[in-house]
Every structure is written in structure tokens, then in C-alpha cells.
């Protein structure tokens, strides 16, 4: 019986590996993913807030009411300038010709700061700034910021941790998924921008 179970388990693993290999091969042949050695792209991707404060807009707040926004932590796959493509739970590639102008964590922090500042009319400081001492602290983990090949979708997921000036800690997960996205830089870049703005808006509303 154990031998039969072992054979079934081995067959299942082989089938999963074959499926992942076929999907990766299809994406590679169609020019959707890159495994390294590619030529530099003609343009770079960035994130742009859908709303921004007008020039001359002034805000003020007591130190305990200001918000110190820290750069989010990211997994190794996101600590680069490339857009990850999730083939399955065990396989990862990078999207061809999709390169960020800055690391995703930096871009998302800047987008989030502008959204919170605009939507909540709050003073937002950069985490680590001496002026931010004693302020409310917002940290987080940007766990997903890329393309899911099995769903043909971009996924942005941010786990926020808020430390209030009263010492109370709150946590919340925010996520945006946009399906039906083609696996190319021209489609994935704008879709990630929309999803990132969606998540940033969710966070801003949570903080109100």
C-alpha cells in the first residue's frame, strides 16, 4: 500500500513539474518571459498616482498626528528592477522588456505617500526622517507585485502594520487583482499601475 501511495505521489509531482515546464516553455517561446541575457528595454516602467496634491497645497499637523511611512519589505523576487512572472507555486521567471525605473518598494512607497496625503489630507513623512520621531508609523510587506501566468492577471498585495501614537498596533491586508492581462510589458505595466493605485486607495481609506 505504501509503495502504491509513493508511486501515486511521484506521478503527481511529475505531472505538476511537466505542467509548469510546458507553461514556461510556451511563455518563453512567445517572447513573454526572460531568463536573462536580454537586451535593455527601450523604455522603463514607473508608478503614477491617479490623484495628487495641487501645487501650493499646505498641510500641518502636530508631531503625534503626522504619519511616518516606511519603505515596505519585499521578498527577494521583488528586490530587483524586473517584473516577476509566477508560473506556479514553485517556478518563477521575469517578464521580457519589463524593467522598473526604481525598485518596486521605492515606487510603491512614493505612490502610497501621495495617495494618503491627497485623500486623507495628512502630513506624510519618510520613515527614518528625524522629524518623524513620535509620529504614527506605517510599515508593511509588499508580498506580491507582479504577473500570475496561471490566471493571466497582475496581483498587488500589501500587508500593512500601523503603530499609533498611543502605542496601539493594527494590521490589515490589502489586495488588488486585474485579470485578462496579456503577458507583455505594454499590458502588464499599466495594469500594475492601476492595481497599485487601487491598493494605495484602500490603505488611505483604512487610515481615515
Task: Write out the residue ranges for each language-model feature.
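Bacterial N-terminal signal peptides that target proteins for export
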Residues: 5-22
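C-terminal motif of bacterial Sec signal peptides marking the signal peptidase cleavage site
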Residues: 28-31
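Surface-exposed short loop/turn segments
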Residues: 33-47, 114, 118-166
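A structural "domain/chain start" motif
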Residues: 33-101
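Envelope-exposed proteins and targeting segments
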Residues: 63-65, 79-81, 88, 96, ...
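Solvent-exposed coil/turn segments that connect beta secondary-structure elements
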Residues: 72-74, 88-90, 143-145, 159-165, ...
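Structured segments of extracytoplasmic/periplasmic soluble domains
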Residues: 75, 110-122, 198, 202-206
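Short secondary-structure boundary motifs at beta->alpha junctions and helix caps
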Residues: 91-99, 167-201, 205
